[in-house]
Amino acid sequence: MASNDKGLEEIPEGQIESNYDEITDSFDSMDLKPELLRGIYAYGFERPSAIQQRAIMPIIKGSDVIAQAQSGTGKTATFSISALQKIDPNLKACQALILAPTRELAQQIQKVVVAIGDFMSLECHACIGGTNVREDMKALQDGPQVVVGTPGRVQDMIQRRVLRTDQMKLFILDEADEMLSRGFTEQIYDIFQLLPQSTQVVLLSATMPQDVLEVTTKFMRDPVRILVKKQELTLEGIKQFYIAVEKEEWKLDTLSDLYETVTITQAVIFCNTRRKVDWLTDKLTARDFTVSAMHGDMEQSQRDVIMKEFRSGSSRVLIATDLLARGIDVQQVSLVINYDLPANRENYIHRIGRGGRFGRKGVAINFVTADDVRMMREIEQFYSTQIEEMPMNVADLI
């Protein structure tokens, strides 16, 4: 951590320039602790996102890092994985401190750290305003290895000497632009002054206004700068249809009738639960249809094999849960069937959207029961799109 007041380097506001472009494109090649790797795969990650491919390694190696990335790019897991790799679970003391602008975000980050660190026997405490100070103090005295919190409460706990900083290796500021614009500048500067000089600093921000750049110049040493543009998903070029299915029980027959059409090309069929994925796979297999299935309960090695077969084209139909919608690189898939409409509308675009640059054409077919009509209308409104009744000649469109 640098602490100098030299003149601000001339960095244009708004966007940083990357000075680092090394990419590590699989978690296996990051040389992570086996129990951390296990946690990453159990959490449902398959391969690192763009920011994870670029930022995890420099953080692990000890560089100060500035990453400019929007939410939805996988940044929480980026710094969670890095922090978990760097801490010593046997040392009962705070070794990584993560600051977030809101209590909700802090709690969300805590959940991710706990989930990914599931096999590591460590503690992660959320140190946030609005909770009982005494309980907070007690939890911090137990020496959780990772503390995530909001600036006000964290500063208070460090000043009371309850949150000890002598073993602190890593200080992470998430959504730095938000924190500074919410008036936490003074608290953040105070926290910096209270940390050991040797603390490594990682700063994440969607935008780079002047006040964020000032923090980077004052408190960071030769930072690695990484800019990750969010790839916009689009529904353009995708023909979206629905089939009215009166009852849930009729979906299976509807899908069987469609099977010939489906296998002209490769298709992904989405269900809302792992249980449903298994059930549907069993039912279709019993009817002599060839399908493969994938969800988060499976061992990573098993999922890799299934994905490989699907990518190579040797399996044609893949049944999956939402967990994998974000992880499946299905650019080659031209047909997606929502056996169940997604439980939340944001997932709709992850299931059927395409990276705009590829401009892939595709067809999406939604099975809609009477109970689903409202959700379908919501999806149409949310994306300003039209989902029309499926025509008879759908095979010609795929």
UniProtKB/Swiss-Prot annotation:
Matching InterPro entries: DEAD/DEAH_box_helicase_dom, EIF4A_DEADc, Helicase_ATP-bd, Helicase_C-like, P-loop_NTPase, RNA-helicase_DEAD-box_CS, RNA_helicase_DEAD_Q_motif
Cell location: Cytoplasm
Residues the record lists as binding ATP: 69-76
PROSITE patterns in alphabetical order: DEAD_ATP_HELICASE, HELICASE_ATP_BIND_1, HELICASE_CTER, Q_MOTIF
Motif (Q motif): 25-53
GO CC field: cytoplasm
GO molecular function, one term: RNA helicase activity
EC class name: hydrolase
Domain Helicase C-terminal: 237-398
Enzyme Commission number: 3.6.4.13
Catalytic activity: ATP + H2O = ADP + phosphate + H(+)
Keywords attached to this entry: ATP-binding, Cytoplasm, Helicase, Hydrolase, Initiation factor, Nucleotide-binding, Protein biosynthesis, RNA-binding
Source domain of life: Eukaryota
Record motif DEAD box, residues: 174-177
Main subcellular location: cytoplasm
Gene Ontology annotations of biological process type: cytoplasmic translational initiation
Domain Helicase ATP-binding: from-to ranges: 56-226
Family under the similarity heading: Belongs to the DEAD box helicase family. eIF4A subfamily.
Domain-level remarks: The Q motif is unique to and characteristic of the DEAD box family of RNA helicases and controls ATP binding and hydrolysis.
Function: ATP-dependent RNA helicase which is a subunit of the eIF4F complex involved in cap recognition and is required for mRNA binding to ribosome. In the current model of translation initiation, eIF4A unwinds RNA secondary structures in the 5'-UTR of mRNAs which is necessary to allow efficient binding of the small ribosomal subunit, and subsequent scanning for the initiator codon.
PANTHER family assigned: ATP-DEPENDENT RNA HELICASE DBP3
Subunit structure: Component of the eIF4F complex, which composition varies with external and internal environmental conditions. It is composed of at least eIF4A, eIF4E and eIF4G.
Protein name: ATP-dependent RNA helicase eIF4A
Gene behind this protein: tif1
